[in-house]
Amino acid sequence: MTKFEQYFDYVKISLASPEKIRQWGERSLPNGQIVGEITKPETINYRTLKPEMDGLFCEKIFGPVKDWECHCGKYKRFRYKGIVCERCGVEVTESRVRRHRMAYIELASPVTHVWYLKGSTSYIALALDLKVKEVEKIVYFHSYVVTQSNTDINLKYKQLLEGYEWKSLEEEIYQNQDENNQVEVGIGAEAIQKLLKDLDLEHIAETLRSEATNPPKSFKTPSLKFNKKMKRLRLIENFIATGADPSWMVFTVIPVIPPDLRPMVQLDGGRFATADLNEFYRRIINRNNRLSRLKSILAPEIIIRNEKRMLQEAVDSLMDNGRRGRTVVGANNRPLKSLSDIIEGKQGRFRQNLLGKRVDYSGRSVIVVGPHLKLHQCGLPREMALELFQPFVIHRLILQGLVNNIKAAKKMIQKNESSIWNVLNEVIQGHPVLLNRAPTLHRLGIQAFEPILVEGRAIKLHPLVCPAFNADFDGDQMAVHVPLSLEAQAEARLLMLAPHNFLSPATGQPIIMPSQDMVLGCYYLTANNPSQQQGSNQYFASLEDVVMAYEQKKIDLHSYIWARFDGLVDGDQPHDPIKIEKHSDNSTTKFFNNHIIKEDAENQRIVQYIRTTAGRIIFNKIIQESLLA
């Protein structure tokens, strides 16, 4: 595999010049021959099933179809590496070069890029300070445009003329033609290219900047004209900053992507299935070759113009099928996938293949609630954990001397021997895993947890972290990733562990908050419920006795009972007792609404009972244990 020892800081996407596009596709073979231009629309020969020369799958341009074998078969095998066959001109190399070698089509007439003509903002129209409809009329051969003005005939620069207007003026112009006072009129993408080339970016930017210093008086509703000028200024400044030429928005050369990215495969019945892009490229080459031939035989201007317009439409459909004009369809009236369709959307190259790559050491499963878990823990199915941590398990098995090599360790894992689970438990101790729930809309969408092995095939998640993931348990799925290096593990533990992320990055408010079932459970434990009276007004020697009586179903959860309690009672009840009883030994019993205190002769407390419920005791016990832990 080729490795590039070239380090870079960033990737920049910008306009490509025609020279740059040629540079992508052109290659100099070891024998000095320069290849790269595609001139024929043919793909493969249907008798030999080999790519046609100078066609869309040409082996001379893109490289051999079979590893270390030329087109004609004269040179085969690795020992001829780098040799160019003198018969067929194919370089003997690996076939995978066909995945990255590009080519180009030299156009007989310039064509505009549909993204810059018909995008959400028409950058060609903005740069030329024309309306989008006016630019479209010029590009698609409906109107002429003045590319060099003449003061005598009162023609303004960039003025549009209809066909009949130009014909009536043409005779007058050529009769009165003066060498110093010429007029030029153009049509199609060539005219647009000339206008874009003639732009003096520095002068336009200076003019627009001076206008920007005098904005309209009404700031609340700035005029559309002023807004357009500011947009144009931004565009011009970007052109200056990037060093791009506005005329590069008009194609003179079309890049052709590598053939293995638009393959053609033979089906069982002998028929061929091909990528849609090949059809677009074929149409462009056919129309381009026809236009070159018409130009060479000096065909009438109307025929040449029609061919130029068809070439423009063919390039438009390659870039973005259906953006303008009729959508090109294939078999069964299915619209063909253009370059834009391949790139954009959920199934496009970026979201599907680059951002949504499948990664190793990862798993995916349905989540279920794990109320017994601690906040920093998650339940990982044993089957999944064994697969994810397999390299660590194998390493530990070899270290412990249970096996001698990797093959034996893998066999041991496949047999599901009992000792494996002990080793797995040791391996996952202190090794955090990352849980991610799509869509990851903020940084809390992916957090670290310590795995606990659980039975079944579902991942168990602590209910308190659900708001951060925006997760619920109605069938949601989550992905598990294993940080492999020590640095990744340390980062996961220090920065990404769930207890370290209890504040929302958006609002700064706590995001780990009890909700739904938890709040309902807390309410139910501590609520008043007069209908439950079993065991009411009984006395218990301790809080533990109350819980035991509840578990044995001697009392109800909401029955009011009296329980001995030696701690401090803090309530909103009146401090004065409602009743005081004096005893023969000078001790007193004070009765309050919710507690009873017995004191000796010196007012020292002997015993205290509180009026509460089993539910409140359980709630208090859970809170106390959590705080002490």
From Swiss-Prot:
Residues noted as binding Zn(2+) in the record, renumbered to the chain: 70, 72, 85, 88
Primary location group: plastid
GO biological process: DNA-templated transcription
Gene Ontology MF terms: DNA binding; DNA-directed RNA polymerase activity; magnesium ion binding; zinc ion binding
Cofactors named for this entry: Mg(2+); Zn(2+)
Metal-binding listed as a keyword: yes
Residue positions binding Mg(2+): 472, 474, 476
Gene Ontology cellular-component terms listed: chloroplast; DNA-directed RNA polymerase complex; mitochondrion
UniProt-annotated location(s): Plastid, Chloroplast
UniProt keywords, alphabetically: Chloroplast, DNA-directed RNA polymerase, Magnesium, Metal-binding, Nucleotidyltransferase, Plastid, Transcription, Transferase, Zinc
Catalysed reactions, as listed in the record: RNA(n) + a ribonucleoside 5'-triphosphate = RNA(n+1) + diphosphate
InterPro entries membership: DNA-dir_RpoC1_gamma, DNA-dir_RpoC_beta_prime, RNA_pol_asu, RNA_pol_N, RNA_pol_Rpb1_1, RNA_pol_Rpb1_3, RNA_pol_Rpb1_3_sf, RNA_pol_Rpb1_clamp_domain
Pfam families the UniProt entry points to: RNA_pol_Rpb1_1, RNA_pol_Rpb1_2, RNA_pol_Rpb1_3
Cofactor annotation remark: Binds 1 Mg(2+) ion per subunit.
EC code(s) of this entry: 2.7.7.6
Reported function: DNA-dependent RNA polymerase catalyzes the transcription of DNA into RNA using the four ribonucleoside triphosphates as substrates.
Assembly notes: In plastids the minimal PEP RNA polymerase catalytic core is composed of four subunits: alpha, beta, beta', and beta''. When a (nuclear-encoded) sigma factor is associated with the core the holoenzyme is formed, which can initiate transcription.
Family recorded in the similarity comment: Belongs to the RNA polymerase beta' chain family. RpoC1 subfamily.
Protein name stated in the entry: DNA-directed RNA polymerase subunit beta'
